[in-house]
Amino acid sequence: MMTEREKWNSVSDDYQSVFKLGINEYNSSLLRFWEENGMLTPGCRVIDIGCGVGKYGTYLASLGCDVTLTDISDKMIQLAKENMKPFKTPWTALCCDFNDLTGTEEMFAEGFDLAISTMSPAIHDVGTVRKMSRMTHGWCFVARFYDWQQPFRDELMHTMGMKPKQIFERDLKVDCADIIRAVSAAGYMPRAKYVDYDWSDKRSVSEMTDYMYRNYFGDSPNKEILRMTAFAHLKGMCDAEGMIDDNVNTKVAWIYWNTEEQK
């Protein structure tokens, strides 16, 4: 079984492909939310915990923010550094496991006006919520998937005689509730907003086969048989150009709190 770092390294190229598509409506709405609620101002100091390839780092740097990026994946950080190169505003990128940090390291000493963690497991309990909050003199923001529907994936698994299963190990609603409870237990007042986020991934038959193998078949003793079976079925499910539209319909929980407002 892959380590946490190996798991994120294995999907770094996928994240980079999404980054190259540019900002989408969901990203824009999130940036507007931060700005309209006074969380984000031009030139403020922001840390992105579990930054991936630095997608939000580039958006924030374009606003003149001083950006610090952290991620457990060395490949993600390598790509993040490449993506941040065009920006002349201050930025730092660090490969680390947030669990191993104290939050008092020199690079965090000045503190941050906004701390974010979007779709990352880095913030997951009272301890990590407190650590994130202690390094922030303003707002903390965590985004987590609350619901995930993927009709084509389910159709393929039904066709293969398999019971559809989620890509996530934990129940998404339970995970979001745990974060909200952790914020409250840490002494802060959690707020939550739930937003729709839908997209479609266009994949070739081979790319969809690899996606299914990586996310659903890899731990099975019959994984190679499942790979061949999926490939055979997908050849009959693609369009005339050999492509597949894999639609994903989700709801995201935006969980946020002000570190200067304690219970």
Segments (PLM) and residue ranges:
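Conserved class I S-adenosyl-L-methionine
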Residues: M1-L40, G43-G52, F141-K163
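Short alpha-helix
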Residues: D171-G187, A192
